[in-house]
């Protein structure tokens, strides 16, 4: 996202600065980065990918610098803390993941969702999965599927990735060796971000994947060649791709508009892309 923001900023002789610590998203690190950025008085606008809405909104109390969110917005109760959101329609990402699942299992089946707790954007993706599979726009986002249109979520699901590669692979191994669901829907890229490690972890279960006894569908950012190789080898079965560079580009433009006092849309959605082996074969 930052790369797209910086490339767009350079067109206007401007700079897009990336703040915050390295590693997994952390609300306390984000809170501290916002405090320091405000105190520096160096910035004309802020763009925040929200980690924990009710906590982070306190860091913005009394701010007079324009604020937008990208990728992960504030939750509905505090959405007025930003002037606008730029990024994917997170419920649509979940819906796209669910639609891929439906093409493989039109009568439904057993399901496990892979997510990470606290992130508002991921809650919306999970909601999109459940609403689409249940065929109910009012299905509560935190209510597991219990047979709606043939879909059941296992007792040990959803799984929590925790933005930690070791935990992710431990959870993946447990999914294959103990949970035995028909479908794994990961609302983030954690399982495949290290494709070699994913191959190693799933090696004992490759027959189930290749014969589609078990299906894996993943939301990701830019589609890497290692991901399409996993598709070709039928070790995963579908991807929903988010264009983070475009998010960055649009985020800069909205910050620039807000700084100039121009009105900006409350929501600016970027496009998602669906990729399956069948779609690859048809190209």
Spans of features found by a protein language model:
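Short, solvent-exposed amphipathic alpha-helices that sit
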Residues: 1-14, 93-97, 121-152, 167, ...
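Periplasmic-binding protein-like
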Residues: 41-50, 66-71, 112-115, 179-189, ...
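Flexible loop/hinge segments that line or gate small-molecule binding clefts
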Residues: 54-92, 224-232
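Hydrophobic alpha-helical segments within soluble ligand-binding/sensing domains
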Residues: 84-111, 124, 168-169, 221-228, ...
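Short beta-strand->loop
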Residues: 87, 112-120, 161
